């Protein structure tokens, strides 16, 4: 019997192209397994083989999703596969989003099964769990050894058209799909057993979990910008030189509050990024590419805004848990309200950074302050629940373009900030993207 044919999708890191400096790599293909594909091949135990690997840089995919998907699907089709495996992506936000999008596109457009793997808090999970099977993994590559066999086993079941068990049995993340099944015990007995366990304070598992919805209604728009105090917040890790609060480069446990009173421009001598989730070169050259102090100072001088708040707030969103992001957002919102801030511009960079930023956006919104999220990976911001969103240039320089002359780059940044201010002065009823 012929072996099933499998194509493996990887990012630039696991595809052995390079690190963050190669995140802009366009899609390419290689015959046979690459990197973790070798372990995947072994996990199939001779029933299937990885005939080809498609590799794409995380930033390239995030910034060119539609075109990247076309290229990737075309490359996958050349191998005539029976199954596509993507990742695992663990807690890497851009990678998870790409894995989910590729798997979904394969199922919908090629009509073949696909499997991926992610940490449950990866933003790609919320975006794609209903359309593809996602094996639950650890938050880092240390969990590769456990993830690969589970992905291979589920892939083989899909190939053989065998019945897929529950998430607990197979190891995939619950998809929100309910199915009738025959239980060994009657419903009345199961219900009473559950009630007794609850009364005793023992653990029990409901048979009908309810979906959790956490949407915050948008606040009314700012009526008069010329009298408004605008504050800057970022999950992009911009800190004073030396990172005085020692904010972690990943999975941050804190945020910082820093004075920009009298500061007209963020220079390389005084500000840098502490963020470990994107190439820091461009932000270290000019932190205004992540935190647009320069153009907001000009607008303040011109009377377009009443005042730029004397402090900005920063954390590192890379890998930061949703719980911590919400906690940061609540604390920042309380400080903003106490300071009389009228509106907030919040900027984000990479995938989990965008998730973190959007989680903070919701808490600031919940506190009654209108806020706009400026980010490159708009789908993540929408999935988490930001209301006013402005798409930006690129992950490592959301509010700049190093390829442009300085004056043109600043003009580009100003145009983006003007969009953000327009968003803050526009009434919206729900999520709105200001292109």
From Swiss-Prot:
Active-site residues, Swiss-Prot/TrEMBL: 350
Primary enzyme class: oxidoreductase
Cited Pfam families: GRDB (PF07355)
CC annotations in GO: glycine reductase complex
GO molecular function: glycine reductase activity
Keywords linked to the UniProt accession: Oxidoreductase, Selenocysteine
Its EC number(s): 1.21.4.2
Stored InterPro entries: Gly_red_sel_B, Various_sel_PB
Protease is among the record's keywords: no
Reactions listed under catalytic activity: acetyl phosphate + [thioredoxin]-disulfide + NH4(+) + H2O = [thioredoxin]-dithiol + glycine + phosphate + H(+)
Similarity section: Belongs to the GrdB/GrdF/GrdH family.
Subunit structure: Heterohexamer of two alpha, two beta and two gamma subunits. Component of the glycine reductase complex, together with components A and C. PB is substrate specific.
Role summary: In the first step of glycine reductase, the substrate is bound to component PB via a Schiff base intermediate. Then the PB-activated substrate is nucleophilically attacked by the selenol anion of component PA to transform it to a carboxymethylated selenoether and the respective amine. By action of component PC, acetyl phosphate is formed, leaving component PA in its oxidized state. Finally component PA becomes reduced by the thioredoxin system to start a new catalytic cycle of reductive deamination.
This protein's name: Glycine reductase complex component B subunit gamma
Classification lineage: Bacteria, Bacillati, Bacillota, Clostridia, Thermoanaerobacterales
């Amino acid at each position: 019997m012929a072996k099933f044919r499998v194509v493996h999708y990887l990012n630039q890191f696991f595809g052995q192209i390079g690190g963050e400096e190669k995140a802009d790599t366009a899609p390419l293909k290689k015959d046979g397994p690459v990197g973790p594909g070798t372990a995947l091949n072994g996990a199939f135990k001779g029933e299937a083989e990885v005939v080809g690997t498609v590799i794409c840089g995380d930033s390239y995919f995030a910034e060119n999703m539609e075109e990247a998907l076309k290229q990737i699907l075309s490359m996958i089709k050349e191998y005539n596969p029976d199954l596509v495996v993507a990742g695992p992506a663990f807690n890497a936000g851009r990678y998870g989003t790409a894995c989910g999008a590729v798997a979904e596109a394969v199922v919908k457009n090629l009509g073949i099964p696909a499997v991926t793997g992610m940490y449950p808090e990866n933003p790609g999970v919320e975006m794609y769990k209903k359309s593809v099977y996602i094996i639950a993994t650890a938050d880092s590559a240390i969990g590769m050894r456990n993830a690969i066999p589970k992905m291979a086993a589920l892939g083989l079941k899909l190939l053989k058209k065998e019945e897929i068990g529950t998430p607990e049995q197979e190891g995939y993340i619950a998809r929100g799909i309910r199915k009738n099944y025959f239980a060994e015990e009657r419903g009345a007995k199961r219900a009473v057993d559950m009630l007794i366990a609850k009364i005793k304070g023992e653990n029990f598992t409901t048979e009908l979990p309810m979906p959790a919805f956490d949407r915050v209604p948008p606040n009314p728009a700012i009526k008069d910008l010329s009298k408004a105090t605008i504050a800057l917040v970022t999950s992009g890790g911009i800190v004073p030189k030396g990172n005085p609060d020692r904010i972690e480069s990943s999975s941050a446990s804190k945020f910082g509050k820093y004075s920009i009173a009298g500061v007209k421009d963020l220079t390389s001598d005084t500000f840098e990024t502490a963020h470990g989730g994107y190439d820091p070169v461009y932000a270290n050259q000019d932190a205004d590419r992540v935190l647009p102090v320069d153009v907001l100072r000009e607008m303040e001088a011109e009377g377009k805004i009443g005042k730029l708040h004397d402090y900005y707030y920063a954390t590192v969103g890379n890998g930061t848990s949703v719980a911590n992001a919400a906690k940061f957002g609540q604390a920042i919102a309380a400080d903003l309200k106490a300071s009389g801030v009228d509106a907030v511009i919040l900027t984000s960079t990479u995938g989990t950074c965008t998730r973190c930023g959007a989680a903070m956006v919701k808490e600031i919104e919940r506190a009654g302050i209108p806020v706009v999220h400026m980010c490159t990976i708009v789908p993540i911001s929408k999935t988490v629940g930001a209301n006013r969103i402005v798409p930006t240039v690129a992950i490592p320089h959301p509010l700049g373009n190093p390829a442009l002359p300085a004056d043109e780059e600043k003009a580009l940044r100003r145009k983006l900030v003007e969009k953000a201010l327009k968003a803050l002065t526009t009434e919206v009823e729900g999520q709105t993207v200001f292109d």
